[in-house]
Amino acid sequence: MGSSSSTALARLGLPGQPRSTWLGVAALGLAAVALGTVAWRRTRPRRRRQLQQVGTVSKVWIYPIKSCKGVSVCETECTDMGLRCGKVRDRFWMVVKEDGHMVTARQEPRLVLVSITLENNYLTLEAPGMEQIVLPIKLPSSNKIHNCRLFGLDIKGRDCGDEVAQWFTNYLKTQAYRLVQFDTSMKGRTTKKLYPSESYLQNYEVAYPDCSPVHLISEASLVDLNTRLKKKVKMEYFRPNIVVSGCEAFEEDTWDELLIGDVEMKRVLSCPRCVLTTVDPDTGIIDRKEPLETLKSYRLCDPSVKSIYQSSPLFGMYFSVEKLGSLRVGDPVYRMVD
């Protein structure tokens, strides 16, 4: 662990060694804080809180299609279901099999090579060896509604048409696929369904993201990880929405409530990592080992919260949006404290 990381731990009252010990303390702290927040979300009266700047927003990404390339933006709205740039929302589109089951880069790694351009009311998709295709953001209401399946939960999606379905089928060359779009008239996946045994978590809905409306990582945490890897990785391996500079490695583990721009966020959980992190975003090749194995060597959770994270290493944080608004690259990131 680097000296800057040790400084952060000392400042936060956590011991520098061993790593597993302070990770356990941080995880227990997360559970304790969450247990006290049942009635927090939009029900408690506003209280005066101090603001402590902990960093600066250095990057913002929106991922319109789940598992495809992210779109870097300078400014974004934060809705209760995640980021939005104009009419395009984060992970509101998803590739599915013909039976409605989701398809991600875990099964089709080359999805990460599909790039997306936002222009007016259209998405333009490009991929290696394929002609670009233009997809309207607003779909005809007559398009079929599919019953989809995402991590064992039911959710609906409106079919995006035969042309783009054939485009993905031709590109991936394994079986027939469809592209579906979520709209806000549909029912999202709720906290109670995502984590039925964790009743202390604040209530929110998501469309096609894995777990939460916002995913945040610090630059310093990636730097720390790269000191342990033979082959360095970049932030795109981890697909965050917000990247923060100016803090120390894994300091984001301790952030409970944040103010960025005029957006207030509440910590939900740490981000458990899976084999998707081993897909190279530049080649679409899945390694299945790194950086996941290295993360497992020093970023496992405390046994007390193993029911949530199992054997997945933790890297990055999930947040819910408590006060809607907008934020932009360059905004200070404030930790809100009593």
UniProtKB/Swiss-Prot annotation:
Record Pfam families: MOSC, MOSC_N
Keyword Oxidoreductase found: yes
SUPFAM superfamilies according to UniProt: MOSC N-terminal domain-like (SSF141673), PK beta-barrel domain-like (SSF50800)
EC number: 1.7.-.-
Superkingdom of this protein's organism: Eukaryota
Known role: Catalyzes the reduction of N-oxygenated molecules, acting as a counterpart of cytochrome P450 and flavin-containing monooxygenases in metabolic cycles. As a component of prodrug-converting system, reduces a multitude of N-hydroxylated prodrugs particularly amidoximes, leading to increased drug bioavailability. May be involved in mitochondrial N(omega)-hydroxy-L-arginine (NOHA) reduction, regulating endogenous nitric oxide levels and biosynthesis.
Membrane topology: Peripheral membrane protein
Any one GO CC term of the record: mitochondrial outer membrane
Subunit field text: Component of a complex composed of cytochrome b5, NADH-cytochrome b5 reductase (CYB5R3) and MTARC2.
InterPro entries: MoCF_Sase_C (IPR005302), MOCOS_middle (IPR005303), Pyrv_Knase-like_insert_dom_sf (IPR011037)
Cofactor note: Binds 1 Mo-molybdopterin (Mo-MPT) cofactor per subunit.
Site of covalent link Glycyl lysine isopeptide (Lys-Gly) (interchain with G-Cter in ubiquitin): K59, K138, K144, K156, K173, K187, K289, K296
Compartments in which it is found: Mitochondrion outer membrane; Peroxisome
Catalyzed reaction equations: N(omega)-hydroxy-L-arginine + 2 Fe(II)-[cytochrome b5] + 2 H(+) = L-arginine + 2 Fe(III)-[cytochrome b5] + H2O
Post-translational modification: Ubiquitinated by PRKN during mitophagy, leading to its degradation and enhancement of mitophagy. Deubiquitinated by USP30.
Full protein name: Mitochondrial amidoxime reducing component 2
Cofactor(s) listed in the protein's UniProt record: Mo-molybdopterin
One Gene Ontology biological process: cellular detoxification of nitrogen compound
Annotated keywords: Acetylation, Isopeptide bond, Membrane, Mitochondrion, Mitochondrion outer membrane, Molybdenum, Oxidoreductase, Peroxisome, Transit peptide, Ubl conjugation
Domain MOSC span(s) in chain numbering: 188-336
Modified positions (N6-acetyllysine) in chain numbering: K156
Transit peptide, UniProt annotation: 1-35
GO MF: molybdenum ion binding; molybdopterin cofactor binding; nitrate reductase activity; nitrite reductase activity; pyridoxal phosphate binding
